[in-house]
Amino acid sequence: MATPIATTTNTPTKAGSLTIAGSGIASVGHITLETLAYIKESHKVFYLVCDPVTEAFIQENGKGPCINLSIYYDSQKSRYDSYLQMCEVMLRDVRNGLDVLGVFYGHPGVFVSPSHRAIALAREEGFNAKMLAGVSAEDCLFADLEFDPASFGCMTCEASELLIRNRPLNPYIHNVIWQVGSVGVTDMTFNNNKFPILIDRLEKDFGPNHTVIHYVGRVIPQSVSKIETFTIADLRKEEVMNHFDAISTLYVPPRDISPVDPTMAEKLGPSGTRVEPIEAFRPSLKWSAQNDKRSYAYNPYESDVVAQLDNYVTPEGHRILQGSPAMKKFLITLATSPQLLQAYRENPSAIVDTVEGLNEQEKYGLKLGSEGAVYALMSRPTGDIAREKELTNDEIANNHGAPYAFVSAVIIAAIICAL
């Protein structure tokens, strides 16, 4: 059985908590149901977002005071000083016993300094603290530019970090460079006069004629994502430099395709695997000079596989959704209510006893408080259902691996696609 990784050396002992969440990039639409639940249930919300629509949404849904952290930015002080103050104002309310939520645009752990500091300090002081996942600019970039980081690999790095630590750029993989419009900037002036230093580095590793893409994800409903294609030599032109600002990202596609190591391929390759379908899955290098502009039309192999759909029979091992309406409703509510989830974790039996409409097996499984029991009850093989096979309490209690079968299949598929 896997051992959970400890997120703190101190068991929370004090009233008050800190949750850090992300608002995503696209206004309001990227706010997750989980984050929305915390906005509605937290005593106080602090936010640092990049558009007025998201700010309005937070204020309309927060039950308590909603404070804009951008007031701590000032052109006369460093960003680091601003981040220290943002962190501290959140912690003061946590220390006063409040359940505090901090909302930062994008993913709250990506290019966000005060979020990590606040969580670390809160835990050291004995408070419960955690981070919720959010939609990052990188997620938007993958969608808008339509490339898969699992194919060929991907390196991401902040522009100043790339230069000052001489991080390697790999011409065989996808390279994503963040904050290229504020190279070497530590305050709020965002003067990009160090941008040519980055261009020198790109030209050294990729040459002046390699294509790069300037990217900025869409934010408010009226906006569209900015996707501009230049050569590295183009970046030296003043009119091109003026396109870049503090939120600009640069995507540098692979220049060459890395050769396959035949010895390693033989060791890793599954017996009998056909090369054709593997190559068909591998996406073309849309933005690269190596783009083979492959067609996704049906070749003989693909046509044969598609034709099998006409007589397809669902395999017996396929799992389908089960569970009473009461169980489905309870688990959906549990997933979208932080307060109910906390109460359930503290005493599953007490919460389950308040739920009407559950059958005895569902009550038993839910009182165990384990994910395996939920999968055992709600995801049943078609063969078991056809035979009207009843689950035993031991089967419910001892189910541990069911949720990972599908995930494993997806991971294996991704590996095959990357070959």
Swiss-Prot record:
Provide the positions where the record notes the PTM N-methylalanine.
Answer: 409, 413-414
Name the Gene Ontology molecular function terms of this record: methyltransferase activity
The segments labelled Methyltransferase domain in the record are 1-255
The ranges of region (Precursor leader) come to: 382-404
According to the UniProt record, what class of enzyme is this? transferase
* Enzyme Commission (EC) number: 2.1.1.-
UniProt key word RNA-binding: no
Where is coiled-coil annotated? Answer: none
Residues recorded with modification N-methylisoleucine: 411-412, 415-416
Q: How is it modified after translation?
A: GjuMA automethylates at Ser-408, Ala-409, Val-410, Ile-411, Ile-412, Ala-413, Ala-414, Ile-415 and Ile-416 before being processed by ae prolyloligopeptidase which likely forms a peptidyl ester upon removal of the follower propeptide, which then undergoes macrocyclization with the N-terminus of the modified core peptide. Peptide backbone alpha-N-methylations change the physicochemical properties of amide bonds to provide structural constraints and other favorable characteristics including biological membrane permeability to peptides.
Q: Does the keyword Transferase apply?
A: yes
The Swiss-Prot or TrEMBL record describes its family as follows: In the N-terminal section; belongs to the precorrin methyltransferase family.
Known partners and oligomeric status: Homodimer.
| Biological role stated in the UniProt entry | Fusion protein of the methyltransferase gjuM and the type I borosin core peptide; part of the gene cluster that mediates the biosynthesis of a type I borosin, a highly methylated cyclic peptide with potent biological activities. Type I borosins derive from the C-terminus of the fusion protein, and it is the same protein that methylates its own C-terminus using S-adenosyl methionine (SAM). The C-terminus is subsequently cleaved off and macrocyclized by a prolyloligopeptidase to give the final product.
UniProt note: domains: Within the homodimer, the clasp domain wraps around the adjacent subunit to position the core peptide into the other subunit's active site for iterative intermolecular methylation.
Protein name stated in the entry: Methyltransferase/ribosomally synthesized type I borosin cyclic peptide precursor gjuMa
